[in-house]
Amino acid sequence: VPLRQGVFRRQNGSLSFCVRIKYKVLRFRRNSEVEKKLKKGKKVTVLGAGNVGASIAFALAIKGLCSELLLIDINKPKAKGEAMDIMQGNAFCPSCDIHDGDYPDAADSDMVIITVGIARKPGQTRIDLCKTNAKIMASVMPEIVKYAPHACYLVVSNPVDVLTYEAIRVSG
């Protein structure tokens, strides 16, 4: 079905998107007051904007599981690009404030998802991968804990058992 025209309209505090398809008008409305009540105070920080971090951030945004989503990465242009991609792809999903930033922006996060680390390279042993990713975890955890000490932390990086222990050990 061909898309003829689409218009965003803001009426009475809600966002409306009108699409005209074959002379029928479909309306998609989002009630901003209801959305605020459902997701009030849910701030999620994703450390690492690689494939895993970006996928998790996208899933959180399209499911409407948070009201604010922060992407932090050592490669700042990558984090900014992923945040912009998710914002642009989030037009028909529940509203979520998506942005990139740095550790101080993670203050008052309800959840921190840690996806930092490098992928296993050809010929690299699992022990070498463990050592490299443990060093990365040891550098990241003290910084994020300083700004989000009461957050729930979720480690999604390989090897997850060793890195979870390392996260607990270095965070105090």
Residue ranges of model-derived segments:
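Glycine-rich Rossmann-fold phosphate-binding loop(s) that bind the pyrophosphate
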Residues: 49-50
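Conserved NAD(P)H cofactor-binding loop of Rossmann-fold oxidoreductase domains
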Residues: 116-118
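Rossmann-like NAD(P)(H) cofactor-binding subdomain of soluble oxidoreductases
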Residues: 125-172
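N-terminal Rossmann-fold NAD(P) dinucleotide-binding loop
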Residues: 53-54
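Conserved N-terminal Rossmann-fold NAD(P) cofactor-binding segment
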Residues: 68, 72-110, 124
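Aromatic pocket-lining residues of Rossmann-like dinucleotide-binding sites
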Residues: 60
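A short, basic/flexible loop-to-alpha-helix module at the beginning of a structural domain
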Residues: 33-42
